[in-house]
Amino acid sequence: MKTRVMYMECKSTGQATIGRVSFSKTGSTLRYRSLEFISLKGSGFKANYLETGSGEQYWISGPRKDGQDRLYASSVPVEIDEDVREEYLREIRGLL
């Protein structure tokens, strides 16, 4: 299964995480930890995936090099999973 470091933001709570996501063969389903997301195929409002367990809408994309991933400014910090922290800072942000 193909994996990639991605930015994930829950649209209802604003909670945001950078972590490793795995893709189905078609790319229409993503998995992160125990969560499964299906593509909204353009039907969501400022969201592109639906978490199948809760029905919550998420914005999931590749993290930006400048670190400005949020759609709207927020005081809630973006969490970075420990298993991808070094890769994110070195390869995506170019900080290490």
Name each region found by the language model.
Residues 1-20, 29, 35-96:
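Mixed-charge, low-complexity intrinsically disordered regions
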